[in-house]
Amino acid sequence: MKKFLTIVACFATLTLQAQLQFNLGKGSPLQKMQVAEMAIKNLYVDSVNENKLVEDAIKGMLEQLDPHSSYSSAKETKAMNESLQGSFEGIGVQFNIVKDTLLIIQTIVNGPSEKVGIMAGDRIVSVNDSAISGVKMSREDIVRRLRGPKGTLVKVGVVRPGIKDVLTFRIKRDKIPIETVDAYYLIRPGVAYIRIGSFGATTYEEFMQALMKLQVKGATDLILDLQDNGGGYLQAAVSIVNEFLQRNDLIVYTQGRNTSRQEFRAHGNGGMLTGKVFVLINEYSASAAEIVTGAIQDQDRGIVVGRRSFGKGLVQRPIEFADGSMMRLTIAHYYTPSGRCIQKPYVKGDNANYEKDLDNRFKKGEFYSADSIHLNDSLKYQTLRRKRTVYGGGGIMPDYFVPLDSTQFTHYHRQLAAKS
């Protein structure tokens, strides 16, 4: 009897393998993975969560690629989309999960977190005295702990670059409206100031409304503030750049191993074709913000002021699954008009060093001194009209360097802000 059961089990395994080899081809990596999944499902001694097995397998594959290819569950996907559309009740931050830690990309202007002094680059390590860092907590669980009804309090522990002790903040949750143009006004007669916090579904319309109102008041020149702008929708960025460039000027192009070169060019019908333009950036300006900055710099349409931007220039295609979950897969790189790749270097599968890049820049003094930035001659490029030297190698290098203001938040200010 025992021998008979062994033969039956072996036959069942062989049947699974034969079926998949017929459908997928003998020796195919996909066949190997599906044989393993089917074997676990049908032969494993205990019950298993098949959905979790598949999700973990997808995450494992993506971890071996670039730092920005990612998978999100249906609930996580919905939560991420809310940061660009609609409104919600919470603490008012946009964040990524970086090596099991919540890294704040930016705070919502006038939102609960900004009001108490939380900043881009902070890492939230605990919520209401419960650790959320280093415990492999899902994004969904973290979001659930941070969000809550308007008016309720939440206590968070924050690790900030350059500060040894964990900072404690008490935040009163509030309704978070999503307006991506944070501020606009005449900074002096004839000079407009517009700050864009992120590039969402309504950013272009918000920007145009602000620009036209300021032009009616006499604005001819513009300061465009993209500091701490973590990016967003490509089309919003392209539409805004179109307002500054002449007809057929190249804005950005993409190219990948399996994708042909795709160019985005200006139509020449913009509302800001003349007048001086200054773009403000810092180390947290990324993705769509870098596309805008790189186009204006390379086309000699304006001057870039600040510090080297983040360096996120990967084109990601969202691949939606039937259950509402999503995989964002990198398919190409973004290049500025002069040919500079916006993406900073990375080693596939080595996210740990990639995630330390900003910390390393800080330690090397790059945030405080332009002399701390060393670039090879091979990274030199030329702007398209005036043939000025600009640099590649990841991120956008400003034309004029402005050091980080180390006096922005004193120890006393942090203590007061943490206590609301």
Positions of predicted regions on the chain:
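An acidic helix/loop motif centered on a single conserved Asp/Glu
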Residues: 48-65
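Conserved functional hotspot residues or short segments at active or partner-binding sites
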Residues: 341-420
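Extended catalytic-interface subdomain
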Residues: 317, 329-347
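PDZ/PDZ-like peptide-tail recognition elements
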Residues: 56, 68-106
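Hydrophobic beta-strand signal
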Residues: 125-126, 303, 328, 343, ...
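Cleft-lining beta-strand/loop regions that shape enzyme active-site pockets
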Residues: 18-29, 33, 37-50, 73, ...
